[in-house]
Amino acid sequence: MLLELALCDAALGKPGSIRMEMEPFFPTIWTVFHDGCVDKVEGSIPGTVSVYVGIEYLRERFAEPGEHFIVTLPDCVKLSFQLYDGENPIVDFAALGDECPAILSAEMEGDVCKVFMDNGVMELSSADGSIRLDTGREVPLEELLEVATTYWEEWEAKSRNGKPE
């Protein structure tokens, strides 16, 4: 949660340094992808699921060309999406990608990671996860957190000077 609060403070232009402590993969990965969109989901339950996240302001900070981060969820036993105005959860991966939900925040509820989005809540349960660029290069969570922290520090400095992006 420390990273989430620091990123939110920086986004709001609040003074103070951004501190980074290692957090578990879930829910940290979804918190760092704040404002990113789930563009596509592939795989099967139970099994390995790949979630394609488009988040331009972070992706462009990597030298390799591409548009997405791919979050791989091995041994995934649950992935569903409940629209705020829907009755039944969406479990069809193509339909979930069609909604293109934007990630806001995430929290753990037992073994389930709840990812709160602009139009609903995605719930997932997986033993672990990994991140790679759409070029195939693996990105350790620590590297992604470092890149995100640098982005928000720069954003905060620009906003203090009256020059937000």
Regions found by a protein language model. Give the residues of each.
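Surface-exposed, interaction-prone regions used to assemble/regulate multi-protein complexes
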Residues: L2-E165
